[in-house]
Curated annotation (Swiss-Prot):
Segments for region (Disordered): 86-178, 226-254
A Pfam family assignment: Homeodomain
Gene encoding the protein: MEOX1
Protein name: Homeobox protein MOX-1
One Gene Ontology CC term in the entry: nucleus
Function in brief: Mesodermal transcription factor that plays a key role in somitogenesis and is specifically required for sclerotome development. Required for maintenance of the sclerotome polarity and formation of the cranio-cervical joints. Binds specifically to the promoter of target genes and regulates their expression. Activates expression of NKX3-2 in the sclerotome. Activates expression of CDKN1A and CDKN2A in endothelial cells, acting as a regulator of vascular cell proliferation. While it activates CDKN1A in a DNA-dependent manner, it activates CDKN2A in a DNA-independent manner.
Location of the protein in the cell: Nucleus; Cytoplasm
Gene3D superfamilies reported for this sequence: Homeodomain-like (1.10.10.60)
InterPro entries cross-referenced by the UniProt entry: HD, HD_metazoa, Homeobox_CS, Homeodomain-like_sf, MOX-1/MOX-2
Naturally occurring in which organism (per UniProt): Pan troglodytes
GO biological process: hematopoietic stem cell differentiation; positive regulation of transcription by RNA polymerase II; regulation of transcription by RNA polymerase II; sclerotome development; somite development
Alphabetized CDD domains for the sequence: homeodomain
Keywords associated with the record: Activator, Cytoplasm, Developmental protein, DNA-binding, Homeobox, Nucleus, Repressor, Transcription, Transcription regulation
Superkingdom assignment: Eukaryota
Molecular function via GO: DNA-binding transcription factor activity; DNA-binding transcription factor activity, RNA polymerase II-specific; RNA polymerase II cis-regulatory region sequence-specific DNA binding; sequence-specific DNA binding
Length: 254
């Protein structure tokens, strides 16, 4: 071990540490005014690390006791010194009240949190713009889809409406396919009577395996054809007017 360090360990009262000189620039003035230095703590309370000889050689002004002093003991020593010497001038930048010391560290994060909150709100506001744009685009897309679906429905309805008259016209244009025997019997009956009674129409329909409506429609068409061929409104073969004959022969046929 270095002889300087060993002598420091043996001495019970080492010289005043340099921390007071460093902390107080008016150390010389204090000596002149008669204020004694605060009592140093014995070296036995602190650990004795082995310092190389180069440290003492490089810093001859520093004693071994100053090098051996640990930082965690400094606040206690300062507290003891301030209690023993209350008249010693203290700088406001060095010591703060406990309440102010507790509030100041919290004020920073609080202000930071407020700033963070405002910044986060700003971020939300700034990011809200694209979200609104996307919402507008989505609404326009939905409106376009609805319009297209409506157009499709309207077109389908129009096609159905167009198809319905065609179907009805086709149904109307459907004609009964009469056989040769049926046509022969109908022509023979028309040669005798242009208008049929209801009972005679029923008999012909049963004999020819037709409906009364089919027989009635055939006679109507046959009369129109006969009128076109002869021209004008002819007299019935029986010498009766067609209106009168139809009304007298079959009052309930129509």
């Amino acid at each position: 071990m270095d002889p300087a360090a060993s002598s420091c360990m043996r001495s019970l009262q080492p010289p005043a540490p340099v921390w007071g000189c460093l902390r107080n620039p008016h150390s010389e003035g204090n000596g002149a005014s008669g204020l004694p230095h605060y009592p140093p703590t014995p070296f036995s309370f602190h650990x004795x690390p082995d310092f190389p000889a180069t440290a003492t050689a490089a810093y001859p002004d520093f004693s071994a006791s100053c090098l051996a002093a640990t930082p965690h003991s400094l606040p206690q020593e300062e507290h003891i010194f301030t209690e023993q010497h209350p008249a010693f001038p203290q700088s406001p930048n060095w010591h703060f009240p406990v309440s102010x010391a507790r509030r100041r560290p919290n004020s920073g994060p609080a202000g930071g949190s407020k700033e963070m909150g405002t910044s986060s709100l700003g971020l939300v506001d700034t990011t809200g713009g694209p979200g609104e744009d996307y919402g507008v685009l989505g609404s326009t897309a939905n409106x376009x889809e609805k319009k297209s679906s409506r157009r499709r429905k309207e077109s389908s309805d129009n096609q159905e409406n167009r198809g319905k008259p065609e179907g009805s016209s086709k149904a109307r244009k459907e004609r009964t396919a009469f056989t040769k025997e049926q046509l022969r019997e109908l022509e023979a009956e028309f040669a005798h009577h242009n208008y049929l009674t209801r009972l005679r129409r029923y008999e012909i329909a049963v004999n020819l395996d037709l409906s009364e409506r089919q027989v009635k429609v055939w006679f109507q068409n046959r009369r129109m054809k006969w009128k076109r061929v002869k021209g004008g409104q002819p007299v019935s073969p029986n010498g009766q007017d067609p209106e009168d004959g139809d009304s007298t022969a079959s009052p309930s046929s129509e």
